């Protein structure tokens, strides 16, 4: 059976298929983890430890060596995306209630959902698109995008906007596995290869555990809001990214469009933030479902828009 091949045909499938399987299990057999115990319970409830290993391996996979132009392009896109998410957090924090929108088609939208969906780029999607529609240097710019992975930047944005307060040790705890992996990976290429190969392997495991924190009814209830959030991510982050790419990064805007997506890893952010800041616990489940939908929407729309933009503004694709 070509199971992996079928999963790869689904946008973000490696993350989303196990996520929905986990949600299915949690909806219809919510006590399975406690009933089975032992290793099975670890797989079902082990989101945090599995993610800790994934962050370590992600850090180990990043090679420090990069050209100046590559770092410039990557830095421009990362800073622009994070700055945009911060502005959104400031505006949303002033108008949205702390527990998010409770009624109507946009029920479930919260500051946490908005920031989590907007502050992290799908680096794999970006690299694939720029390999096709950009230059090798532009494709290689995804190197710094890996630094967005995990809850650290979301914590910084929520803290800087005054929406949440985190103890200093929580920032250290959030980034330490990544930094240790990054250090080891750059000290020894063999370790980088060893741990780097595990990044993709671990995704289905933390996705399944994460899915076991979600009820399918929440996903159904937030369907329209999730689609709206995905489109909003492309518009709100895409426009500043295009402008930054053109006027600072020296590109034609294609890289900006390619970076205007929600990363699959962002689906885990609401739960991680709620784990450190309990005031977000009431909105974490809905935010997770919304970000998951946003990942699907942006994974489908961003390649289409990028292709159209490149055809219009890139000479070699005109």
Curated annotation (Swiss-Prot):
Q: InterPro entries under this entry? A: 2keto-3dGluconate_permease (IPR004684), 2keto-3dGluconate_permease_sub (IPR018395)
Reaction(s) catalysed (UniProt annotation):
2-dehydro-3-deoxy-D-gluconate(in) + H(+)(in) = 2-dehydro-3-deoxy-D-gluconate(out) + H(+)(out)
Write out the GO MF terms.
Answer: 2-keto-3-deoxygluconate:proton symporter activity
As for membrane topology, the entry says: Multi-pass membrane protein
Origin, by domain of life?
A: Bacteria
Q: Which family does it belong to?
A: Belongs to the KdgT transporter family.
Record's protein name: 2-keto-3-deoxygluconate permease
**What organism is the protein native to?**
Pectobacterium atrosepticum (strain SCRI 1043 / ATCC BAA-672) (Erwinia carotovora subsp. atroseptica)
- Which gene codes for it? kdgT
